[in-house]
Amino acid sequence: GKDEWAVFQENFDLIHENFFRKLKERYPSLTPSDLKLCALLRLNYSSKEIAKMLNLSIRGVEAARYRLRKKLALDGKDDLVTFMINFK
């Protein structure tokens, strides 16, 4: 059967107009775990909530967010959550 994440991804794509597809097109280097993080940030989850969902430590989440910013080439003043919410 499909894993929970695959189902989540499909539903999320429907609601958020191909969010994952467009992200992957624009940023081909994003991994499946990057995409998970992107989705949770778009839903405005806190680092604490994300840590729980992804089974990471808070520091692990902070590190993942940092790597994600690098991949998206965001500079210091760009907010990751705002970027995800506004991404089309």
Where are the model-predicted features located?
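Cytosolic nucleotide-binding catalytic cores of signal-transduction proteins
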Residues: G1-K88
